[in-house]
Each structure stands twice: as C-alpha cells, then as structure tokens.
C-alpha cells in the first residue's frame, strides 16, 4: 500500500487542479495580487531542492531555520526544504530589544544544535555577529553542477518511506519565555488535515483567506496546507492591512468568494466596530453568502461581541447565521482540533459570557482530569485539566526531554495546561490557563475575565485590546495582588487622562476581585502582539517582577503626583483625622491618593469596604455611625460635619443616594429590592464610572422613627418627586431590582405621563409584572427567611426547611436562630446586630404588605426584561420563569427586549456576577439610544 506525505498533497493539487493555487497581496496593496499556481509552486520548490542538495549543510534530515518575510518567500522555501528532505524550522519575529534577540538566538542555536539559517540578504543584519549563526541567503543560492536527485521529486514515495518522519518544526513560547520546538510529523499533519476536512468540508466551498504570518500554525496548517489538501484556492493578505482596516477582510471575501477565513476575538471586535461606523449596509454592497466558516481562536471569544457581529453579517450581507465558529487548537495539535458549529445559539441558551469551543474532530480525543486526583472526571460541571490524545496530537518536544515529561501523563495524554470542562452537551468550555490563575487571599480569578471587564468599561485613555492582567506578588506580600498593564491612548504628559484611566481601572479591579490592583501603562514597543494578536502575559509579568519596567514605573508615579486638578485634601480637624485614618486602613490606600474630599463611591469602594470602614470608624470614635449618614455623605468631610453637628439621626427622609456622580450619558436611577437597602448597587454603580451618573432610591423605614410606605403607589410618588428634584428633565433611565421593578414601572409611568417619551429605558431586573400577589402573601417569617437568604445568612434551599422551625416562635427567638446559623464572617461583614436584623425584617414584611391589591396597568415607552435562573420557590425551569417575564410585553409601547443573566435571583449583584449584569444593562441602554 502506497503511503502519502506532504509532498503527495502538493503533487496531487498541482496535477489535479492545474489552474488553482495561491493569490498573494503585497503589503499595502489590496488591489492586485500576485498569482502562484500549485504547479508553479511545486516546480520552484523542486528546482530549489536540487540546488540545496548540492550545498553543504542541506543533507536530508538537516534542521534549517527559515527566517523570511512575506508569504511567497516562506511558501517557496518551506516546500523547497521539504522536497530536499530537510526539516524546516519556522522562525518567529525577533524582539526589537537587542539583548532579548541575542538571548533568543543563542537559545535556538543550542536547541536546534547549530542549524543553518536560510534568510534574505536584507534580513541578515537582524543576527548579531557575535552569536555566530550560520547564515545562507536565498539570493546566493544558484544551480550547481551536480543536480539534486531523489525519488521524492515529482513522484510518490516508495513503500519504505517513513511517514512518521518529522515534516517541520514550529516554535512556541514556553513557561520561561524561551521557545520550545514542536515537531510535526507527516502522519500527524495528515491526520489533522483529514479531521479538519471531515468537519469543515472545504472541498464544497470557495477559497480560503489568510492574513496571519507563517510563523503561526493557524496560518500554515489551516490556511495553507488544508486548502492544498482540499484542492481549493487560497488568498493571503498582509496582517497590517487587515488590522488597520478590518473591512478589507470583508471586501476580499466578497471579491474572491471566500468560503473560510480566520479572526481572533480582537479582530472580530474591530470588525464589529468598523461596521457600526458605516452609514448603511448599502454603502458596501457586498454579497458574503459564500462565507461558510469564520474560524476564531487564540483567545477567549466574548459571546456578546461575536453574536452581535454574527447578526450584523447575516442581516446586512447574507452570511450564514452559524458562520462564526469559535475553535480550540494549539501548535501541538496542528491548530484547530475542536470547532463550535452551534454558535451563538448554544451560548445564548446556556448563558455563557465566553464561547464554548465545540467537540474534538476525528483524530483527537479530549478528557478533563481532576485537579486534586488527576483522574478523569465524570461531573460535567467540574473544572479540571484538559488533556488530549490521538494521531493528530504531537508526541513530544524536540531536544527538550524535561518539557516532554512535564507535558505528558503516565498513560500518554498531552497536558495542554488549560483548565476546562466538557459540559453535558459535550461542548468544550475553557476556564483559563492553570499557570495564569490569579490567587488572591485564597480566591482564584481568571485574567481574561478581568481584562474583559476593563474592555467593557470602555475606559477613556486605554487602547482597546491592549490590556493584560496577571497575579503579582510585591516584595514581602503575603498573597498575590492583581496587576493590570495597558497601552495608553493619551500623550505621556497628559496627567489628567493618566489619572482618570488609573482610577477607572482600579474601580473595575476592586469590583472584580475585592482588591486594589497595581496599574501600570506601558508603551507599544513593550506590549507587542504576536502574529495572532496575542500579548504574552508571562513575558509582561516576568518583566514587571524582574524590574525591567522600572523606568515606566518611575515615570508613572512622578506624573501622577503632578496632577493637581483635584488635589488630595488632608484632614482639617480631629473627627476628619480619625475617619480618614480608618478609611486609609480599610481601603488600603495612601494619604497621597485619598483625602477628606475624595468622592468615596466614585473611588471604587465596595459595599463590604463601606461596612468594614463603618465598624473601624465606630471603634476609633467610640460611638455608632448610622449607615444612612455614610451613604448620604459623598465625602469624609461631609460625614464629619454631620457627626459634629449631631445631624446623624433619622432627620428628614430623602430617598436619593448618589452612588456615582460622573459621566455625560443619561443618569441611571436604580430602585431597591425588597428590604429597601441600596448598598446592593454600590459595585454596579462603580462600573459606570466616567460613563453615566448612577443614583439609587432607598426605602423609607430603614431608620428608627421612619414609617414605611403603605403602598407601591405611595413609594412611586415619593421617588418620582425625588427624581424630579435632582433631574428636572428627561430623558430618564429607570430600573428596579426584583420588588423594585414594580415601583420602577410606576415611577416610569409618572415620568412619562405627558406622553413625551421621556423614559426611553425602563428595566425590570428579574421580577414578572404580576408577582405582587405572591409577594403580598408573605408573612413576617417568610420575610425573614427571604431576607436572610438574600443577605447570604442562609442558603436558598434552607428557606423551606427552616420555615416550619421558625413559624410560631417569638420574633426575637427567630432572629436569634437565623443569626446562630449564619456564617460569623458574613455577620461581621454586614455589621448585623439582632436589633438591626429585626428592623430590617419588619421593613421587609411591611414592603410585602404594601403590594396587597397592586395590579400593574398602563404602559411606558419600552420595557427591557432581565431574567436569571429561577429560584425553586418561583419556578421550576428557566422556560417557565421566562414565560412569566413575557407578561411584561403588554406594558410597553415598543417591542419588549429580553436579556438573560447568569446567576441566581438573590446573587445578581455578587462579585462573581455584577460585571456581567453591568455589561448586559449597559448595552441595553445603549440600544435604547441612551
């Protein structure tokens, strides 16, 4: 039986589709490509192979580093080396820093055992003369007197040929930053190509389109070898042209009737942004119905971004709705080995923030093993180590036995280094790299989730797509901290923009991790992206830890200290001094960063920080500070004045609490859930920093002597008047959380009562419109149980089991039993006393009674419904819960929009979920023109 290898692939394509081949656009030219047929490529490769065979150092089996620019040179000389029986090693771009470049080349010289390097004369200057690389430029290669002869030239190999011989080596970065060499054999590549073709079926579609350099396996395997395997045309364009203007990608798809291309998440985001800037689809009359596969990998795919792009491409240009296919692959698997052909439907149903990656293709088996035992897991929800096996997976690193031992299990499975789960639907879901997890005080955070939250915040002064997060342990620290580096979009001397960007990033970091991140802007020469658009998180982390960025740190610190537009004001009296001391301790900031006139909520303080500061300040001052005084005081100076004047009792009821005063967009008004407290919104408000002001409305009855509202309408009247005092004119954006949805609806109607459409946005956060009749049936005990669950004093499933135990007990005894079951740490975090919980429960019960007889009527301009996983007491399935939410349709004049949210009803504003709520809420308001 005749065996085949890569040479047979090109021979077959050259003989079968003589007119087909490769179109190459030169950098800066996207109008007139150069054409190279597969037959011409084979002829050039065979001719060069004969010449190489006459030259010393190019014997069959020799390693040759291929360091060339441009697709044409790389293709011709890659195949020339393969035909000559040599093993090409695809070089990666060299670092600009001379010492880093020298270190890399010395490492390659050792790793590859003193190879020859094939390059162009114009690139030889990139090699420091003291490194001693053996260079051979392609211009000097000419025909010799002894032609290279081999049975591999122009005819299939004989039966004795070993198809497991190494075909080529790819270089990939290791954990130390030094490159590892990945050997790809003929049999491995052929297995991978067969698996890809079985899934993608390129033979049935048009050409491929590539913009990625040949040093990346996605370009070489997916966009060069695979089209040859499928005997279809391939188009190549310079990366700089596509990244500079992503719409060129669509223009070329239309022009060449492209069936498959590739774009990582960052390019999809740029493409969406470019399309949204277009005046109308008619300005670009493209027909993109030919595009079957828009593969995406290399970084996590944000579902919202990709789904919006998919809708735009489908509606405006005829692209199939399942065109975008998030994929997983590595150099070690010959690029893509798992493709998601159910995007975005699968992600929408399962409410994923980041796209799943489908199922493994033929030739690759996948398993997830336990982080603790190393055994394969059976639980589809368990995150573990992703491991691969099969003929499409490599067998070990070249000349690096230690890395090979570390990367394979005793039973021969490849450890990818990724954390993952394979869900009940068989879909691969990545959860980050195991070595990149950020561990802070025992809690683990995924860097790409923090990066995504910063991107979502659209921080002014931060270049999109150039933010990197990682764990960083300063000297003498007991735990890791979060470090965030970014590429500034402002001039170096612009200290105002520098300070605003830093503060905004700090706010997001606090909300995501509960800790204050270390923030550092770096320049474009340092934050260099790979050919696939990735920045090496490990290299940046190593640079920070080694002191390589000391100059950036000194410049950043010096310029931040120069900022005087909002000077940090020191304490002016004893009360301010004591309050400030408590704040500096609890908020983990210095007196240079935080003063008595620093806006507390805008600074990024979380609700738990606020409670901890309250407790610390009370200890120092020796008396209680009402929470009302704190949340109604924007600064320490205002709070100190209240305390000194004795005006920290109940006073006159004012429902408005400004949580975030900054921003130019329409203010957002948030109405409390049952229980009446607004601290639940603190973290959410912080994410809107510099975007739009955020005000919350607190219930009457939280303080001694305040009577609760007797009805939904009474509360709505009070809130309407309060909103009008602060914001006399529309447009208005109003949202309510749970119980607050009913009040918010009534407030929106009052604001909209003159028919001027002054409320473009009314949002209901997880409560159906006719739920008042259920709430009104809650007695005091049920109010206590639901309040305790919402405060995380008890688990949600304990509501029913504890009900029978508490019912009939005296109220003080029931309070004691709840506090006895609650985690002590949670009680301390909430600063909760029996008397405080009693008052809170009475208010909750009174608010429940206020819903008696309430039935929503009338309409507001629009309704946006946000719904979660249902509580067992409210609905048994998500579909049942959504059906109840659909009743909101009758209360909006425009089409009601429904937005799924992750998490449970009572946990929406928790640290794990709040940034996701922000993302969905913010985009819903943008869609309503706000």
UniProtKB/Swiss-Prot annotation:
Residues 570-647 form the Carrier domain. GO terms for molecular function: phosphopantetheine binding; transferase activity; very long-chain fatty acid-CoA ligase activity. The keyword Transferase applies. Pathway: Secondary metabolite biosynthesis. GO terms for biological process: fatty acid biosynthetic process. PROSITE patterns: AMP_BINDING, CARRIER. It holds the Pfam family AMP-binding. Residues 31-440 are annotated as: Adenylation (A) domain. The modification O-(pantetheine 4'-phosphoryl)serine is found at residue 607. Its EC number is 2.3.1.-. Residues 667-920 are annotated as: Thioesterase (TE) domain. It is an enzyme of class 2 (transferase). Keywords: Phosphopantetheine, Phosphoprotein, Transferase. SUPFAM superfamilies: Acetyl-CoA synthetase-like (SSF56801), ACP-like (SSF47336), alpha/beta-Hydrolases (SSF53474). It catalyses: 2 3-(4-hydroxyphenyl)pyruvate + H(+) = (2S)-2-(4-hydoxybenzyl)-3-(4-hydroxyphenyl)-2-furonol carboxylate + H2O. The keyword Coiled coil does not apply. Nonribosomal peptide synthetase; part of the gene cluster that mediates the biosynthesis of butyrolactones, natural products that show a wide range of biological activities such as antitumor, antiparasitic or anti-inflammatory activity. The nonribosomal peptide synthetase btyA is responsible for the production of butyrolactone II, the core structure of butyrolactones. BtyA first activates 4-hydroxyphenylpyruvate (HPPA) through its A domain to AMP-HPPA. The HPPA unit is then loaded to the T domain and eventually transferred to the TE domain. PANTHER family: LONG-CHAIN-FATTY-ACID--COA LIGASE, MALONATE--COA LIGASE ACSF3, MITOCHONDRIAL. BtyA has an A-T-TE domain architecture. The adenylation (A) domain recognizes and activates the aryl acid substrates, and loads them onto the thiolation (T) domain. The thioesterase (TE) domain shares the missing condensation (C) domain function, and is responsible for condensation and final product release. Belongs to the NRP synthetase family. This is Nonribosomal peptide synthetase btyA. The lineage of its organism: Eukaryota, Fungi, Dikarya, Ascomycota, Pezizomycotina.
């Amino acid at each position: 039986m005749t065996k085949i290898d890569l040479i047979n692939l090109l021979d077959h394509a050259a003989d079968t589709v003589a007119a087909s081949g490769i179109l190459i656009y030169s950098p800066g030219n996207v109008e007139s490509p150069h054409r190279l047929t597969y037959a011409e490529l084979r002829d050039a490769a065979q001719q060069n192979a004969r010449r190489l065979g006459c030259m010393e150092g190019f014997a069959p089996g020799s390693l040759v580093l291929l360091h060339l620019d441009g697709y044409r040179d790389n293709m011709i000389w890659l195949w020339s080396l393969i035909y000559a029986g040599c093993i090409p090693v695809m070089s990666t771009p060299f670092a600009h820093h001379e010492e880093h470049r020298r270190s890399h080349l010395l490492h390659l010289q050792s790793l590859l055992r003193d190879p020859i390097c094939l390059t162009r004369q114009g690139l030889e200057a990139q090699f420091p003369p003291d490194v001693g690389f053996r260079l051979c430029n392609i211009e000097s290669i000419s025909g010799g007197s002894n032609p290279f002869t081999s049975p591999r030239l122009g005819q299939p190999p004989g039966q004795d040929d070993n198809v497991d011989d190494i075909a080529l080596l790819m270089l990939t970065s290791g954990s130390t930053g030094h490159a590892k060499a990945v050997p790809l054999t003929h049999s491995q590549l052929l297995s991978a190509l067969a698996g890809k073709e079985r899934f993608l079926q390129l033979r049935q579609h048009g050409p491929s389109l590539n913009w990625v350099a040949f040093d990346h396996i996605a370009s070489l395997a997916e966009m060069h070898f695979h089209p040859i395997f499928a005997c279809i045309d391939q188009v190549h364009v310079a990366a700089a042209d596509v990244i500079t203007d992503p719409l060129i990608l669509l223009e070329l798809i239309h022009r060449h009737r492209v069936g498959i291309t590739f774009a990582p998440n960052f390019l999809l985001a740029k493409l969406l942004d470019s399309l949204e800037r277009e005046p109308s689809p008619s300005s670009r009359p493209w027909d993109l119905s030919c595009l079957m596969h828009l593969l995406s990998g290399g970084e996590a795919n944000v579902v919202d971004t990709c789904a919006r792009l998919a809708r735009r491409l489908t509606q405006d240009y005829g692209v199939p709705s399942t065109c975008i296919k998030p994929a997983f692959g590595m150099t070690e698997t010959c690029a893509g080995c798992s493709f998601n052909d159910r995007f975005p439907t699968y992600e929408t149903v399962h409410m994923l923030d980041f796209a799943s990656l489908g199922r493994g293709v033929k030739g690759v088996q996948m398993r997830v093993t336990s982080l603790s035992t190393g055994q394969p897991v059976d639980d589809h929800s368990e995150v573990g180590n992703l491991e691969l096996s099969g003929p499409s997976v490599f067998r070990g690193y070249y000349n690096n036995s230690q890395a090979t031992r570390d990367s394979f299990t005793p039973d021969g499975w490849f450890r990818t280094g990724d954390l993952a789960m394979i869900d009940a639907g068989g879909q691969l879901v990545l959860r980050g790299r195991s070595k990149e997890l950020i561990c802070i005080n025992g809690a683990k955070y995924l860097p790409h989730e923090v990066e995504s939250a910063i991107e979502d915040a659209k921080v002014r002064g931060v270049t999109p797509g150039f933010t990197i997060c990682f764990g960083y342990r300063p000297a003498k620290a007991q735990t890791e901290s979060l470090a965030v580096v970014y590429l500034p979009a402002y001039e170096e001397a612009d200290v105002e923009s520098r300070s605003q960007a830093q503060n905004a990033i700090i706010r997001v970091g606090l909300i995501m991790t509960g800790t204050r991140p270390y923030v550092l802007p770096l320049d474009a020469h340092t934050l260099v992206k790979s050919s696939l658009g990735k920045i090496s998180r490990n290299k940046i982390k190593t640079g920070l830890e080694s002191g390589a960025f000391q100059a950036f740190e000194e410049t950043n610190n010096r310029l931040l200290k120069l900022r005087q537009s909002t000077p940090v004001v020191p304490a002016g009296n004893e009360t301010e001094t004591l309050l400030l001391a408590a704040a500096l301790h609890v908020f983990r900031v210095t007196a240079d960063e935080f003063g008595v006139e620093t806006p507390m909520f805008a600074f990024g303080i979380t609700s738990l920080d606020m409670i901890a500061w309250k407790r610390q300040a009370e200890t120092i001052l020796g008396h209680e500070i009402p929470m009302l005084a704190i949340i109604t005081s924007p600064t320490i100076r205002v709070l100190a004045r209240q305390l000194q004047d004795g005006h920290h009792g109940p006073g006159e009821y004012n429902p408005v609490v400004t949580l975030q005063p900054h921003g130019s967009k329409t203010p957002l008004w948030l109405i409390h859930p049952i229980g009446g407290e607004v601290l639940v919104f603190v973290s959410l408000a912080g994410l809107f920093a510099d975007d739009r002001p955020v005000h919350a409305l607190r219930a009457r009855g939280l303080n001694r002597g305040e009577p609760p509202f007797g009805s939904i309408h009474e509360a709505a009247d009070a809130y309407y008047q309060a909103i009008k005092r602060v914001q006399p004119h529309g447009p208005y954006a109003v949202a309510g959380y749970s119980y607050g949805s009913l009040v918010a609806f009534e407030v929106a109607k009052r604001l909209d009562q003159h028919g001027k459409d002054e409320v473009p946005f009314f949002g209901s956060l997880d409560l159906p419109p006719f739920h008042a009749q259920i709430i009104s049936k809650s007695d005091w005990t049920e109010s206590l149980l639901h309040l305790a669950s919402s405060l995380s004093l008890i688990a949600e499933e304990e509501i029913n089991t504890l009900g029978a135990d508490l019912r009939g007990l005296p109220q003080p005894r029931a309070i004691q039993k709840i506090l006895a079951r609650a985690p002590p740490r949670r009680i301390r975090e909430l600063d909760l006393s029996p008397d405080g919980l009693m008052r809170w429960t009475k208010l909750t019960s009174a608010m429940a009674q206020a819903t008696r007889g309430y039935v929503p009527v009338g309409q507001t301009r629009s309704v946006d419904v946000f719904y979660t996983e249902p509580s067992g007491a409210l609905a048994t399935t998500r579909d049942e819960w959504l059906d109840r939410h659909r009743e909101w349709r009758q209360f909006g004049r425009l089409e009601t929009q429904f937005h799924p949210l992750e998490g449970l009803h009572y946990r929406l504003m928790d640290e794990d979920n709040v940034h996701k709520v922000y993302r969905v809420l913010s985009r819903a308001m943008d869609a309503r023109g706000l």
